[in-house]
């Protein structure tokens, strides 16, 4: 980074608070302005069409997707009890209705990363198959699960760097085709995620450093082999577009509940942000399908506010939290990314309404509250969105519209967390809430 630190601190006073690990709220002054965005609605529809072509394959290889006919769909759940408890804990009013977009329940890898990660694997598999064989777009893609294609895919490799969930989604999908699959994992990655990948035949390379280093190492290694495809969490267009297709899905889910976003009926969408690719893709997808009334809010740990910092300063991926002496350490492993993606900040410059940072303790509290009130279990980083609701309500200028507001908290992962691990998360949350611990019944 070439910018003078002292000049940055003077120009953006909130950076001083961020350096002290204080929770901050930032409203993007450029939100809603006109801007050129390098993605289109046609590309989102292309993603949806590709997912549809692969539905027979996914239903064949991953039977859990059969109930949705091979589609990756998660429920949108109204969580009245959690809303009431959240308001009570914060001694605040939360006008409107709160929903959970439960990507934590997505089939295959149980996280938001299923959308982008699996999509990019599918697109690469389609490229190999249509290039090397007579496969056409009108064929039944279930044929890709046959030994003939498995043998073909075994000549190719897929590689990625990850803190955990992206590696899980890509690893499980790529291994199902027979690709030689390698996941470079950062020091923050949970052991159970590494174990699960290895159990699925994936090679895991462990790094005693940040995910940025793991990604760089993976990128360098993949470049040496022309048959190895690297999925780049810091700059992949296909990852971004894979996430964006959810805009089509949630538009229908909202409409089914009588929710049609506009200026008088705002829909706030609270998204945990790590490298920023998945929340940016989701935000773009929602706003391309519903151009009015969508207010994306990113939530990041106070110790790793990389996307907020990059957007606030307009330095985007050119600044890392460590440049300001922030340690980058958090128990929200999926959010432990010291530098934002090359795509996220630039695309979100006018699409992001605001950002909030939180302490790790808060996400454990909300994790436990969600389990107690709604019987829904998520991993720590997936509870991050709850931390941003009250600050966003307080900051929102159009107070009259708040009574018609819809708040969508994006639960980004949790389905695959082992029971003993989830119990530890829950116990920590109950302890922080100063309440008796219970045994979970998932």
Curated annotation (Swiss-Prot):
Pfam families in the cross-refs: PALP (PF00291)
Record flagged with keyword Coiled coil: no
Keyword Ion transport recorded: no
Residues with N6-(pyridoxal phosphate)lysine modification: 113
Family: Belongs to the serine/threonine dehydratase family. DsdA subfamily.
Enzyme class, first EC level, given as a word: lyase
Annotated Gene3D superfamilies: 3.40.50.1100
UniProt-listed Enzyme Commission number(s): 4.3.1.18
Domain of life: Bacteria
Listed cofactors: pyridoxal 5'-phosphate
InterPro entries: D_Ser_am_lyase, Ser/Thr_Dehydratase, Ser/Thr_deHydtase_PyrdxlP-BS, TrpB-like_PALP, TrpB-like_PALP_sf
HAMAP family: D_Ser_dehydrat
PROSITE patterns: DEHYDRATASE_SER_THR (PS00165)
Name of the gene encoding the protein in the UniProt record: dsdA
GO biological process, one term: D-serine catabolic process
Catalytic activity: D-serine = pyruvate + NH4(+)
GO molecular function, one term: pyridoxal phosphate binding
Keywords: Lyase, Pyridoxal phosphate
Record-given protein name: Probable D-serine dehydratase
